Amino acid sequence: MLKVGIITWHDHNNMGGALQAFALTSIVRRFTDSVQIIDYHDKAKVKVKLRIQFFLSKIGNIFNLNWKFRYPFLDFYHKYYKLTRQYDLKTIWDFDSSSIDLLICGSDQIWAPNKYSPVYFGEFYRGRKVSYAASIGLNYIPRHLIDSYKNALETFELVTVREEKAVELLRDKCGITAQCVLDPTLLLNVEDYKLIESPVSDIRSPFVFCYFLNEKNVYKQELEHYLSNCEFEIVGYSKKTDDSQWIRKLKNIGPKEFLWLVHNAALVITDSYHGSVFSLLYHKKAYIFRRFEEDDPINQNSRIEQLSSYGFIGKSQIKGLYETFIDCTVEEFEKELGILRARSLAYIEGIFKSC
């Protein structure tokens, strides 16, 4: 049986990061039962959260703690990830390469230049390497990193990335041939996600679900006209403190609750790539903000633009926003997604056929 390791951003307490790791693991399990996520944390101090989760589950009743909702991400990791031992920046270089037959790097923005780490290029591993939907995110690779990218990627058997912009950058700057594939969250059917949803109590239907990651932008101003006529309850997650004035912020929600909220919302408003992806999968109307200004040195809008290039989202009548199902019907979306999904899955299948 082929033994596979995955190196990705699996434990950043981020909805999209957790769900892309879940999705890629689920797809790989179609080809082998032996798949593990390498439990790497880039801080020298190893996190202990996963070590205490079993203990918390046992004492929860004693202290009247519902630890699954108090630690929703830990619950998700515990239930859906098979992890290796923990590694940090010092110990990852002692990784036993003989413990796996293949390393998959991806997905998510593990190759973002502003967060560059040789670990996410698999430089700790001596063996067969491929990438799946790894994202550079930015519109450039700094000159001082070009050789690092080139030298690392020349050791890969196959390089696939999430955005066409990354294909261009790797070709033009590094001389590396890469293929553009779907984010792994788009490879699973929506029914797969419905199976792991967890309901959120005390929400009146219909409701608007907001999911914002930008801490600076004041989105309410741009939605003023729509919100003034909205009688729905507005709930969600935002990193911006002031947003609590118009959004009822939900506490203790993790990936399973996030899926339920998207599924049951009358409308989704987001600046998140994966917020956009799951709105599409659940066939939801969504308003999508571009989180970054065009001149921002860490502009990551290429992710949203990739969805637009597929025809999945289009320019909204609300200035500056994208909107789902404005340039295509649900039926057209599913047809095009099916074509792109088959193409992306063929790359994964090809990896295992060559083993």
Where do the protein language model's features map onto the residues?
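Active-site anion-handling motifs in enzyme catalytic cores
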Residues: 1-355
